[in-house]
Amino acid sequence: MKRKIRIGIPRGLLYYRDYILWKTFFEGIGCTLILSPPTNKGIIDKGGNISIDESCLPAKIYLGHVKELSQKCDYILVPRICNYGKDNRVCMKFNGIYDVVNNLFEDKILNYDIDYIKGKFELFGFIKMGIKFNKNIFKVLFYYIMGKIKNRKYYLSLVNKQDKILRSNKMKILIVAHPYVVYDEYLCGNIIRYFKDEDIDILYSDRVNRKIAISYAEDFSNTLYFLYSKENIGSSFYYKDCVDGIVFLSSFPCASDSLVNELAIRKLKDVPVINIIIDDSTATSGLMTRLESFVDIIKARRDNG
């Protein structure tokens, strides 16, 4: 029996947005996926050792996950995302990470490009990848479409679940952060656990209808450059009257977040806001003290009506 092609999936960046698409597609065309383990200090150290000092923490973590997969699979999936149109760019790390990985590692790299300006669409990239492993183009197309449907269905289920949370009378906090930051247990697990231990409902900025979030972001500013920043910031204005507080979580040294979050914080009125920047040496004790003070302020506001 022919051995299945093993595709390595680094547990970082777009993993938190597109994993269901990747899983459905590659397993459907006869491949098997190998996930890197959850982020830990060893992975961060491995990524940091092969990164330039100016790299942001998520990029270092991503390289650490690639290092963890190196020599353990036939291909490593590293998408290259440039833009979703002239007014919807993405951070340069999504554009450059493929070239960085390709230069640092000897493994075979599998990728698809998204660059709407140059006519490079996701569909074409998946077809190109798929026929490498399965010559039946109809099967390749079928599992790409199935992957998109399942990925969107899962995303909409999260949006609907979050909408139901809004109906509760419990204290609610919105966390504004990129998925690869807030859902990384090693980076933000202690923050999430703290709010849950305090019996606070948590809402997430990526679990909002993206079109609605973008429309709110464009009302805030028509010059926002990055698509993912639009989605984050738009959600903060969409939810500002529905939550008791907003937590901005970003990683060091993210240039886009440092600018956009600061602009949003200045515009958000009548709601407590805290801005937290995480790096690989963030002290838990100091962070918890800040969160405790933030929650105390929110509770005092609720008690005073």
Please report, for each region that a protein language model flagged, where it lies by residue:
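An N-terminal assembly and electron-transfer interface module characteristic of large anaerobic redox
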Residues: 1-305
